[in-house]
Amino acid sequence: ITVPIAKNNVKYNQINFVDMPNAVQSNISLTNNVDLKMNHPEYHAVLIANKILGGGFNSYLNMNLREEHGYTYGARSSIGTDKYASRFTAGASVRNAVTDSAVVETLKEINKIKTEFVTPEELSNAKAKYVGDFVLALERPSTVARYALNIKTNNLPEDFYSTYLEKINAVTAEDVKRVANTYFK
């Protein structure tokens, strides 16, 4: 099998608009390619940064686009850690009339996490969410099997999951800002 090489990201922001005259809402998606593997030293910091930006209800994106402006039922971001090619995506489905405003606000929140330090409370809440999810997931046998498979298929160190919480809790506000600048374009 030949695995295609991911294309480089564009050098500037570009907007591709697809006009759908009968659509009642717009789906906005801000996306860039990333090269992030689970065995990368910045992996845990990227998880925390994404959680704060758009990985939960209290994230920057959701609080702005849903709670502050009422543009959407939910805004989110995600980042992949695929073995070959991955991407960062931030977006939401919004009313047509606020598409442009939602894009501006999404870019504003991405810029915020890249230029400002997250608060101690935001950092603590994101870490607590990962710790809680990790502990609960261990109660399912399928999770333990998936973790063992991940170690083999993703070239992870044998202690990857036994040091997972330690690495999550070691993430700093400086780490979040640094990785946001690297991975959230």
Regions found by a protein language model. Give the residues of each.
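Acidic/polar loop-and-plug regions of large Gram-negative outer-membrane beta-barrel proteins
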Residues: 158
